[in-house]
Amino acid sequence: MKRPFRITIIARRWLTCLLALTLLGATPLQAQENSGNSNYRLLFEQADEDYEIGRFNQVLAALEKQVGKMTGSDKQRALRLMALCYLAMYETGKAEEYAQKLILENRYYSNVDDPIDFTEIINRLKAGYTTTITTASSIKESVEEAPAPVTIITAEMIENLGYNKRLGQILATYVPGMSEVYENETDNMSMHGAYSSAQELILVMENGHRLNNRLDNGYAMDYSISTDKIDRIEVLRGPASSLYGNVALSAVVNIITKSGRELNGVKMKYGHGAFGTHRADITMGTRFMDADIFVWGALYQSDGQHREARDSTEYSKKFFFPHETGHHAYIDGYKGKPTYDIGMTLKYKGFSLMASRKNSKKLAQYGTFGYYDYDKYRPVNNTYPGSGELTSSLGLGYNMQLGPVALNASVYGDWHETIQYDASSAEYNDTTMQKELADGCFYYDKNEDRTLGGSLQASTAYKAGSMQGNVLAGVQFEHFAVTDLLTLFGYGYTGMAEEGDQLVDLKHHENSWSFYAQAKHHFLPTLILNAGLRYDIRYRFAMDNVTNLSPRLALIYTPRDELNLKLTYSQAFVDMSFKYRTLMREIGNDKFQSQYLTALQLSVMGKIAPLRLSYDVNLFYNQFENLHIEQIYSMNNEGVLRNIGLEATATYSHNRLTASMNAYWNKVVKAENYFYSETENAIYAVPKATVNLNVGWKLLQHRKHELKLYGSGRYTSSKWLLKTEFVLLPNFDIDVITSETRLSDTFIMDAGLKYTYANRLTLALDCENLLDTDHFLAGPSYYMYAYHERGRNLMVSASYTF
């Protein structure tokens, strides 16, 4: 069968030139895309022709004589063609031998023209390499040597969940110990049972650049992150302030984007799903001369699922008063302004440039006191009810080798805007307090802030007799300032009051300095000590300065692939956010302390080769102090939580079948002044146990055709909530009544089917919540509602790679 190599090569060269001219400016068109030797041009032309007509032995004979002399892309091209010839001759062993040599030449080799069976060999050989990460120690190391338990989520694992998943759902599926929590329009996460009003206990990064804002330390785990751009997600399960400082309390999530060399083309993808959902992605990448360029753009919009009391379960009756017909709960609605993610990375020799802009606009599921009618409310500054967050980021880095010392310098900036447009509920039929407050009132709050910073890091390797190791040290500075704010009040859905007085003047600034050091010492090739220490000082506005010392100590033993042991002690902190400290200062509370986590973890991991099984088991003890919770009329910084737990992960891969399972269990040892039920010994809103199972099966795999079936199941144990009710007394005082409510355990199934042709065209059908099970999330406040999750929904998608 003939293969149209020449047409593809011509198209790719045009694409390479177009991207390079656009992003790098004018570049001589006669420059070669790679370091190949044009003297082999005639040899390759003849070899391609012989391969197309089945003269495989002639191709092998011709290339065998020259491949040893080749370098760069010429050698890669020869090795690829030789492997394809052996594969066509059904000599799989020889094909794998040359494919292995090809990967040694280029770890990121990828070619959309390859037959599917050859792509399978390449992917399998790639997977055989030990995964290296940089998130845990800021240096390249294997997962086995990382000083903390690590979860790696690959692009394939993300695809196996379907196209309509947000970041929080992906993390909750693959990371044991992580669970979604929710507060009306904010996608939040808990780790080992700890959470806060903003997603401030887990540090989220993109290529090492912090995404959590500095106003309230939060970052929503929603659709403002394109999943199609992701190469992998590295998750550190445990405290990491010794390297990253503030916010890295219970976990670190580092999103690693694809490289231009890996994609080497243009990919376009579109999906349409239930509830008026549209999702689109475009990714472009290439390597031109010494520059690696990757560009992405993503768009998400959805009307969301509309729920009413009559089509819900008995849970709704536990939380809401009667309401007018035509008003809804809006579940996962993203509309009014598009939710998008655009950005690019450029690497040129030692330089790296990152630029991105992310926007999220999510509808509140409920109004202030229950169901509401989104369409009745007027726009304010072109914004409708819901929560919006816009972030623009820019970073420039430079790496250089100065003798034995590696230097890394970076400067960066983040410009952040939050909008909170809260709508009241519909008019009620009764005479409760809510009726007086629910006459189409609304509240609009906008804040803008800016962060500028820089860092300098140096590292070097050393030897001490038969021992060796690596040390690094660094310094970081940040300047944060609130630059603008606006508060408005409205009534009657469309009426607008004059600009309201600011409850607090947030237009102030703060500076912070951080100094850190780390040593990784190999006593033996199999015995490693990893120690780190970071000192942070924050010059806080109108409050005492705060300092934090964050240590980490890890002892790692890696005797063989079947067994690796890891014992880790670490401490981390989250300073109370600028927003909440400033708000509480106005009511006389200026004694907020940093939130702390001290953790002890014992991990066992390894591979059981005969069973094709990998495993990871982690036993942890956590001691949280000074946790922050929102109370009904104020805030509390005195929360204490101590718990023990177990995490376990197992993965299996053989031929066309891949499967993974993870499980989590925790037990509260002590809890005070926190979201905790003493009678049930349970943390409110989070499960005691979860189990996830994910399976992928290639039903068909033949040359250019592949048909894959994938599915997942998630078991979540029951959760307890603290229901709060307000009763208006005859003298207009308010009586607050609280009671505990149980949400039943659930089992949610997803399934999908994907067809791929020639590694270019992909068609997929995804079904989320296959059994249409009612399930709910709850959030970090004493106004604990049972927030709906989506019911059964379908999405069809198509993608094409040029």
Model feature map: region roles:
Residues 118-159, 617:
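Short, acidic, small-residue-rich periplasmic hinge/interaction motif at the N-terminus
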Residues 209-237:
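Short acidic/polar hinge/loop motifs at secondary-structure boundaries
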Residues 150, 168-209, 213:
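Extracytoplasmic beta-strand/coil segments of soluble accessory domains associated
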Residues 262, 271, 287-383:
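Periplasmic-side early beta-strands and strand-to-turn transitions of outer-membrane beta-barrels
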Residues 89, 285, 291, 296, ...:
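Conserved C-terminal beta-signal and adjacent last beta-strands/turns
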